[in-house]
């Protein structure tokens, strides 16, 4: 789950991380009122969407008068903000963050992720802040410094100090940087985050260290123990299809292709998409119906996929372990009839009650294309999507 920048800063503030004074605004008048409360002479008007690159897309403006705050708020609110993370369709801006300006002397980067190789939380820091960390990793990997934190001890003062020195924090500001790094680590750990990032972390002209941005992603599987994080959820920022899927316990992610995928198991779902790509096709979605798929779930899965106007074909790829193939076949038949399926459907099933499932499909009277292997299924669905 993602949250907005201003919400991330609320979390950081609770853990002792220095952030600029600011408040969210949901209208132009509210933006001006917040600016008046903060006092000038400089304010930053920032679009709040779940994507990076807002500045380059025109979603961050520096205002030097209340009239400019009004002007920029009017420009940004309601705009369809396009960044490298939103895709060509962009994301509508429904809220702003109005903040006091900062005298920026130097921009740095700090972030925390889980490293699955070392099986530890890794704190990263770089002197090249304000840029996409992926770009820094590609062009100047030596500029990124890392510490794999021992979970039993947490981030130590010496580790935080060493990172701060390596990214160019002056000695006089090291204690501030230490508190920010430790606060960021603690916020990551205690909220079950999967990503915590400050980009940029800035050094100001008077020697202060301040988090000018905040980005958090949270492990959705842990949200049951964090109602305070769930309260931050903004459904306007999420794909309506993914929201609908979650109501039926379906793991669904929209993609840009034209071949729908209905699979049981995340690993098999990813392998299925890879195989479709291998044979020249483009998946329209990731969809894992899980190990307990019912007829209702399969029907809802079909409905979700068919809401995509660009859908040209569907591939159902099932391994019958816990899930019986005859149950899936029953769901496929019922789902196809319920939604009046009007695109080619390729089905490949292996495992428990495989023969019974195939027999049910063959006797259903539906124009279902059968396949025995994943490669054959992918080839057939790619051909069907191309109208061959």
Swiss-Prot record:
Domain of life the protein comes from: Bacteria
A cellular component annotation (GO) from this entry: cytosol
Enzyme class: ligase
Cofactor(s) the protein needs: Mg(2+)
This protein's pathway: Carbohydrate metabolism; tricarboxylic acid cycle; succinate from succinyl-CoA (ligase route): step 1/1
One Pfam match: ATP-grasp_2
Annotated GO MF terms: ATP binding; magnesium ion binding; succinate-CoA ligase (ADP-forming) activity; succinate-CoA ligase (GDP-forming) activity
Entry note: cofactor: Binds 1 Mg(2+) ion per subunit.
ATP-grasp domain mapped to chain residues: 9-244
InterPro entries: ATP-grasp, ATP-grasp_succ-CoA_synth-type, ATP_grasp_subdomain_1, Succ-CoA_synthase_bsu_CS, SUCC_ACL_C, Succ_CoA_ligase-like_bsu, Succinyl-CoA_synth-like
Residues where ATP binds: 46, 53-55, 99, 102, 107
GO BP annotations, alphabetical order: succinyl-CoA metabolic process; tricarboxylic acid cycle
Keyword Chaperone in annotation: no
Metal-binding as UniProt keyword: yes
Binding site for substrate: 264, 321-323
EC numbers, comma separated: 6.2.1.5
Catalysed reactions, as listed in the record: succinate + ATP + CoA = succinyl-CoA + ADP + phosphate; GTP + succinate + CoA = succinyl-CoA + GDP + phosphate
Binding site for Mg(2+): 199, 213
Keyword annotations from UniProtKB, A to Z: ATP-binding, Ligase, Magnesium, Metal-binding, Nucleotide-binding, Tricarboxylic acid cycle
The protein's role, per its UniProt record: Succinyl-CoA synthetase functions in the citric acid cycle (TCA), coupling the hydrolysis of succinyl-CoA to the synthesis of either ATP or GTP and thus represents the only step of substrate-level phosphorylation in the TCA. The beta subunit provides nucleotide specificity of the enzyme and binds the substrate succinate, while the binding sites for coenzyme A and phosphate are found in the alpha subunit.
NCBIfam families in UniProt: PRK00696.1, sucCoAbeta
Family: Belongs to the succinate/malate CoA ligase beta subunit family.
Xref: HAMAP family: Succ_CoA_beta
Subunit structure: Heterotetramer of two alpha and two beta subunits.
Name recorded for this polypeptide: Succinate--CoA ligase [ADP-forming] subunit beta
Species of provenance: Burkholderia thailandensis (strain ATCC 700388 / DSM 13276 / CCUG 48851 / CIP 106301 / E264)
Upper classification of the organism: Bacteria, Pseudomonadati, Pseudomonadota, Betaproteobacteria, Burkholderiales
